[in-house]
Swiss-Prot record:
SUPFAM superfamilies: Class II aaRS ABD-related (SSF52954), Class II aaRS and biotin synthetases (SSF55681), YbaK/ProRS associated domain (SSF55826)
Keyword Nuclease in record: no
InterPro entries: aa-tRNA-synt_IIb (IPR002314), aa-tRNA-synth_II (IPR006195), aa-tRNA-synth_II/BPL/LPL (IPR045864), Anticodon-bd (IPR004154), Anticodon-bd_dom_sf (IPR036621), Pro-tRNA-ligase_IIa (IPR002316), Pro-tRNA-synth_IIa_bac-type (IPR004500), Pro-tRNA-Synthase_IIa_type1 (IPR023717)
Assigned keywords, A-Z: Aminoacyl-tRNA synthetase, ATP-binding, Cytoplasm, Ligase, Nucleotide-binding, Protein biosynthesis
Recorded catalytic activity of this chain's protein: tRNA(Pro) + L-proline + ATP = L-prolyl-tRNA(Pro) + AMP + diphosphate
Descriptive protein name: Proline--tRNA ligase
Length: 579
């Protein structure tokens, strides 16, 4: 590809509205342009990277035995009503009507569509297992699209769906897909972790997320310092504390605290350890509990884990914090003055709360707190459950080592769905015993467009992107110095361009009339791993300058013209086929 026949579209200035490095570099490198909030046009350089990731994903899906299909992004609402996700999915589901006022959705996922297909095409257990995949555009009407393509409304995704007649068959395919995902991310040279995860709105019994480690990641992932344990923070269990509850040392007393509306203010004004404070969070109770509100208790230095709290049968789903109006109507005080003593509603306390003694909490009266509260002396122990996020240094749930917490970008998610969708939509086959049985499903997603941003978040420097070789937009850049002024430079550049291209290499030939500094800066910005610089002075010695710009190494050296092709072939093959 010649730059004079290509849309390079690089930018010198840092885009004002780009918050994270991948968004900045994708705009500056001419990979994407914003059309509207959360909607992006992919320019040629971005498209080349996207297609290379697609090819890796497609190759590994084919090796895993998945069959490629293409399903429509526009889906009839009656399928979503049948699965009951029409009511439960939320505002991210874009709903609209056609000219005949028939309701449709713009698909964020395709469980309903594939289940409808399979229930009409598959009738016997003998036709199972089957695993279908597609690489297709999705749409989620995000309330606040941000970070460029990282959280866009329209995005490219690989989604796969498997169908089985036994749990053993599902587990076998699940493991095959787990290994395929691992291979995909290894081929892309990403530093990632596969972590246990919550099934969320997709549903099912078991799931794993594949998280690319990056400081800009929106997710927190937890892993052991010793073992292979790894989980999303939403799922990581906070174990029952080893220590026993200490005996009371303080008397119960109530103190005026007019300027202590938060835990931090209470700690600062009364010089008490934050571990001796209690947060009382009021949420709406499940409609079958007989109560409107209930209280969740966590230690002052801990954060409530909404996913864990939602699993309590007494909590309304989704978990919703009570309005200040409802809190005041039921308790007589507002947030900042709440506590468990004399609270007339169900109470659920975190495990760490159960071993607290001589602690402080709101009195349920404005601007007053109790100090010296003790369980069983001043109030009975409530229901005890795991309600909090783990913190670094907590013991690992598998009993091996302690926990570290890193930020991650979710790029893949696999689920064992079970019969959630087949049950709702009547997807049955005739079993070995001759009776009808529900098909058992698995679901496997990869954010293809998000992978582009995730790779940049991990691999960049002050000059631009450092692409892993397998997904670089071009493998080789040819930079002739003063192309229009030197016949020798032009002839050698043309010869090398033709020869390298004939060998199947992705080559960009910068034939613009630009200063060398501009050419160097553009190639570094868009992240070309191998650069050949051809100038008159080097040609006099039958040489050229070679620069390597990889994710783990940068170097430059002189090469004999006669050695260039064999040198590049060896370098590129070594990166694609590491020992």
């Amino acid at each position: 590809m010649r730059t004079t026949q290509y849309l390079l579209s690089t930018l010198k200035e840092l885009p004002a509205d780009a918050e994270i490095i991948s968004h900045q570099l994708m705009l500056r490198a001419g990979m994407i342009r914003k059309l509207a909030s959360g909607l992006y046009t992919w320019l040629p350089t971005g498209t080349r990277v996207l297609k290379k990731i697609e090819n890796i994903v497609r190759e590994e899906m084919n090796k895993a035995g998945a069959i490629e299909v293409v399903m429509p992004i526009v889906q009839p609402a009656d399928l979503w009503q049948e699965s009951e996700r029409w009511e439960h999915y939320g505002p991210e589901l874009l709903r609209f009507a056609d000219r005949s006022e028939r309701p449709f959705v713009l698909g964020p996922t395709h469980e309903e569509v594939i289940t409808d297909l399979v229930r009409n095409e598959i009738s016997s257990y003998k036709q199972l297992p089957l695993n279908f995949f597609q690489i297709q555009t999705k749409f989620r009407d995000e309330i606040r699209p941000r970070f460029g393509i990282m959280r866009a409304r329209e995005f490219l995704m690989k989604d796969a769906y498997s169908f089985h007649n036994t749990l053993e068959s599902l587990q076998e395919t699940y493991q095959t897909m787990y290994q395929a995902y691992t291979k995909i991310f290894e081929r892309m040279q990403l530093n990632f972790r596969a972590v246990q995860a919550d099934t969320g709105s997709i549903g099912g019994s078991r799931s794993h997320e594949f998280q690319v480690l990056a400081d800009s990641g929106e997710d927190e992932i937890v892993f052991s310092t010793v073992s292979d344990f790894a989980a999303n923070i939403e799922l990581a269990e906070a174990l029952v504390p080893h220590e026993k509850r200490a005996s009371p040392c303080e008397t119960l007393r109530i103190i005026d605290t007019p300027n202590a509306k938060t835990i931090d203010q209470l700690v600062e004004q009364f010089s008490i350890p934050i571990e001796k404070t209690l947060k009382t969070l009021i949420v709406y109770a499940h409609k079958d509990s007989g109560h409107k509100l209930l209280a969740l208790l966590v230690r002052g230095d801990h954060l409530i884990n909404k996913v864990k709290a939602e699993k309590s049968p007494q909590v309304a789903k989704p978990l919703t914090f009570a309005s200040e109006e409802d809190i005041r109507a039921h308790i007589g005080a507002g947030p900042g003055s709440l506590g468990p003593l004399h609270l007339k509603m169900p109470i659920i306390a975190d495990r760490a709360v159960a071993v607290m003694s001589d602690f402080s909490a709101g009195s349920n009266k404005e601007d007053q707190h109790y100090f010296g509260i003790n369980w069983e002396r001043d109030l009975p122990l409530p229901i005890i459950e795991d309600l909090r996020n783990v913190v670094e240094g907590d013991p690992s749930p598998d009993g091996k080592g302690t926990l570290l917490i890193k930020r991650g970008i979710e790029v893949g998610h696999i689920f064992q769905l079970g019969t959630k969708y087949s049950q709702a939509m009547g997807a049955k086959v005739q079993g070995e015993n001759g009776r009808q049985q529900m098909m058992i499903m698995g679901c496997y997603g990869i954010g293809v467009s998000r992978l582009v941003a995730a790779a940049i978040e991990q691999h960049h420097d002050q000059h631009g992107i450092l692409w892993p070789e397998a997904i670089a937009p071009f493998q080789v850049a040819i930079l002739p110095i003063h192309l229009k002024k030197s016949d020798a430079v032009r002839q050698e550049a043309e010869r090398l361009y033709a020869e390298l291209s004939s060998l199947g290499m992705d080559v960009i030939f910068d034939d613009r009339q630009e200063r060398p500094g501009v050419m160097f800066a553009d190639m570094e910005l868009i992240g070309i791993p191998h650069t050949l610089i051809i100038g008159d002075r080097d040609l006099e010695n039958n040489e050229l300058e070679y620069r390597y710009r990889g994710i783990d190494d940068h170097k430059k050296q002189q090469l004999k013209i006669s050695d260039v092709v064999s040198f590049l072939l060896e370098k590129i093959n070594s990166h694609f086929n590491p020992k």
